[in-house]
Structures are given as C-alpha cells and as structure tokens.
C-alpha cells in the first residue's frame, strides 16, 4: 500500500530533532483511515475527510503547520533514506525561502536520478518544474504570497514557484543531495493530463507574465521564419551554393580577424 510505505519512510527518520508529521486523507474508504489510526501516537495532526483535490488537501496541511518550513509527499512517495531529514535540517537556516534537492524518479521497477539545476530561470519554468517532493518552502511564504490555487488540478505548485522565484525574486538554493523517491504514477505524471496542465500553465503565464509571453512568442516566430528561409534557400541549388560559399569565406576569415584584434 502506497500510504503505508510513505508513513514508514517518514517514521523511520533518525533525526535528533522533532518535526511535525501531518497527514491529510481525503476521506478514503480503502483502509487508509484505519492505517493512520495505528500510527496516531506518532502523527502530529491528521484528518480523514472529503476534500476538493490535491491542493485543497495541501492547503489544509499548510494552515495547521507550525514549523518554519513545509515539505510535501504524496501517497507512494518515499524519503530517500533514513538520514534525509537529518541531512537537510542544517540547510534550513531561513536564509532562503525555497530550498530544493534532487529526486529519484521511480516507475515500477525502474529508478532514474533527476538532478535539478543550480540556477533557475523563467525559461526553465516554461518547460520544467521542481517537483514538490524536492522542495522545502518557508511556511510564511504562503501567507506572504498566496496558497496553492485550488482551481488547478495539477500545476499549482509550479505556479507558486514560478511566481515566487521569477516575479518576486524569493531567494532559493539548490542542495546537491537526493531527497525523495518520487512515485511517477501520480496525476501530474499521467500523459493524459498534459493538455489540462498546459492550459493551466498558460493561464498563469498570462496572469503574471503577459509581456514575457509575448516576447517569447515573437522570438519563436523569428526563429521559425529564419528556419523557413533557410529551407527555402536550400531548395534552390545556385542560392544554396552561394550561401555555403559565403559561410566558408566567413569561417576562413574569422580566425584571422580574431588574431588581428587580439
């Protein structure tokens, strides 16, 4: 059972310091409530009740959390090993609002390490994301910025990060260590949800970054036009040979030009 593995992963941590362990269950009837009850004495807070989706449940957890940083695992996700919390704690010194490490992506019996970049950018978030299983976020940031958007089903954590980092310049830091084993059977990894994800991402980009979006569209249009021109020229042998000859002349003279100006 996915939830049981996740609970055991958290309870097996050998950190010398106490940390809150909050479980939000959506009123499931598959035995999860009974499972949680067996660990109730080691869980800081738990509730089993119907919710309005992943981000509604996540926001419930944020609102009851009292620690300086919050971290989220879905049912089926695992902390990388028993020392993960112990190793990560020294980094959480409140210098940065967001700390993130690396993940193991697991699909059935296949595990693939995923190393996130040291530097994040708007262009990174256009096509990628930092999974919440890799992120430790300062609890107060949700009060300062906003809680997860419950209208979205999949990309609210992406929306929070791109807004916090690219719009508000919240300090962040990459920690080069494996944080968790991410179960890729979740909703965000389902290829059938890609269209809904892209639609919600576009809503966020239009809301917070309308000028950036227009610039990127213009750049893409220019790139496409140049490619089309290149392919058009290549169709006509005389023009193509002339262009190749010009490129060869440029390549021949460029090293000499660099040397003369050295």
Predicted regions and their residues:
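Nucleotide-sugar donor-binding/catalytic module of glycosyltransferases
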Residues: 1-193
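N-terminal leader/capping segments at the start of a protein or of a new domain
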Residues: 82-85, 207, 259-262
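Catalytic core of nucleotide-sugar-dependent glycosyltransferases
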Residues: 177-179, 190-217
